[in-house]
């Protein structure tokens, strides 16, 4: 199997073919996802909550991300692998470059960073130094203390600000964008305005791709279950079938449905 590249996702956007992505944190699940056909995975700082048991993503370190990136890469050698730069790992462009080098050497193909136009110089510096960048707008979990909790973003006038941020990130060189917990109407505007692929989570079925935290997809999340989550394991019966069902529902536009979306 050939390695999956950003060019393939760009082609999916052009041909209006939805694609499914998922978080992965270890060898075994990465291999399972790859075996069933998921070719894009994220080593997310969500591991702080799902793996380490913290109440936010803030305690996650670059070393944590690198450790899990190495494990996932061994399980899915041909996937397009995104890795988060965690909280305060990219406060300056220079710091971002140093930490991106660590996770890229661990096996990442691209780094994901949270934030808007203030990251333009960082995105430029990374891309000029051959580090592909995925932006992340909307509900950015590293900003939970600013937001006052995990709340939908981009309603009202904030929607135009988010769209402007998305365009600024693309112009700076970002090659992917994750949109989290925003109204469907805004997600549609952003997806149509950008030439780069947009991956949604809690953004309706109007984005080019979808991502879910694997624990949400399997119904094993402790505590609060996000509105946009769906337990595919409950219907499918086993993990492999659940992965296939998730992919099929994303590709057909069945998931996420209205019950998983915000307005």
UniProtKB/Swiss-Prot annotation:
User: Per the annotation, how and in what number is the cofactor bound?
Assistant: Binds 1 Mg(2+) ion per subunit.
Where does this protein chiefly localize? cytoplasm
What InterPro entries is this protein classified in?
Answer: Pantoate_hydroxy_MeTrfase, Pyrv/PenolPyrv_kinase-like_dom, Pyrv_kinase-like_dom_sf
- Pathway assigned in UniProt: Cofactor biosynthesis; (R)-pantothenate biosynthesis; (R)-pantoate from 3-methyl-2-oxobutanoate: step 1/2
Spell out the subcellular localization from the entry: Cytoplasm
What is the active site of this protein?
180 (proton acceptor)
**Ligand binding (Mg(2+)):** 45, 84, 114
Cofactor(s) needed for function: Mg(2+)
Q: Signal peptide location in the record?
A: none
Gene Ontology terms: biological process: pantothenate biosynthetic process
Q: Which UniProt keywords apply?
A: Cytoplasm, Magnesium, Metal-binding, Pantothenate biosynthesis, Transferase
Give the source's domain of life in one word.
Answer: Bacteria
Q: Would you name any one GO CC term?
A: cytoplasm
Q: Which reaction does it catalyse?
A: 3-methyl-2-oxobutanoate + (6R)-5,10-methylene-5,6,7,8-tetrahydrofolate + H2O = 2-dehydropantoate + (6S)-5,6,7,8-tetrahydrofolate
What EC number(s) does this enzyme carry? 2.1.2.11
Q: Does the keyword field hold Glycoprotein?
A: no
Instruction: Identify the CDD domains for this entry.
Output: KPHMT-like (cd06557)
A Gene Ontology molecular function term of the record = magnesium ion binding
Instruction: Quote the record's binding site residues for 3-methyl-2-oxobutanoate.
Output: 45-46, 84, 112
Q: How does it assemble?
A: Homodecamer; pentamer of dimers.
State what this protein does.
Catalyzes the reversible reaction in which hydroxymethyl group from 5,10-methylenetetrahydrofolate is transferred onto alpha-ketoisovalerate to form ketopantoate.
Which family does the similarity line name? Belongs to the PanB family.
- State the name under which the record lists this protein: 3-methyl-2-oxobutanoate hydroxymethyltransferase
| Protein species of origin | Salmonella paratyphi C (strain RKS4594)
């Amino acid at each position: 199997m050939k390695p999956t590249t950003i060019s393939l996702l760009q082609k999916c956007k052009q041909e209006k073919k939805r694609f499914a992505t998922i978080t992965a944190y270890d060898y075994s699940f990465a291999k399972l996802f790859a075996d069933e056909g998921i070719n894009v995975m994220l080593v997310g700082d969500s591991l702080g909550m799902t793996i380490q048991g913290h109440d936010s993503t803030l305690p996650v370190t670059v070393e944590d991300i690198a450790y899990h990136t190495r494990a996932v890469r061994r399980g899915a050698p041909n996937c397009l692998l995104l890795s988060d730069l965690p909280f305060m790992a990219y406060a300056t462009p220079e710091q971002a470059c140093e930490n991106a080098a660590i996770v890229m050497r661990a096996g990442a193909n691209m780094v994901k960073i949270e934030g808007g136009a203030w990251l333009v110089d960082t995105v430029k510096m990374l891309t000029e130094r051959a580090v592909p960048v995925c932006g992340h707008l909307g509900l950015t979990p590293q900003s939970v203390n600013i937001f006052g909790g995990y709340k939908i973003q981009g309603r009202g006038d904030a929607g135009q600000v988010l769209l402007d941020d998305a365009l600024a990130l693309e112009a700076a060189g970002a090659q992917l964008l994750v949109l989290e917990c925003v109204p469907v109407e805004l997600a549609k505007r952003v997806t149509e305005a950008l030439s780069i692929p947009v991956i949604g989570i809690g953004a309706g079925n109007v984005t080019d791709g979808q991502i879910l935290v694997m624990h949400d997809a399997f119904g094993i999340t402790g505590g609060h279950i996000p509105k946009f989550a769906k337990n595919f394991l409950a219907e499918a019966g086993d993990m492999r079938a659940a992965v296939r069902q998730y992919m099929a529902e994303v590709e057909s536009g069945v998931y996420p449905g209205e019950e998983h979306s915000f307005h």
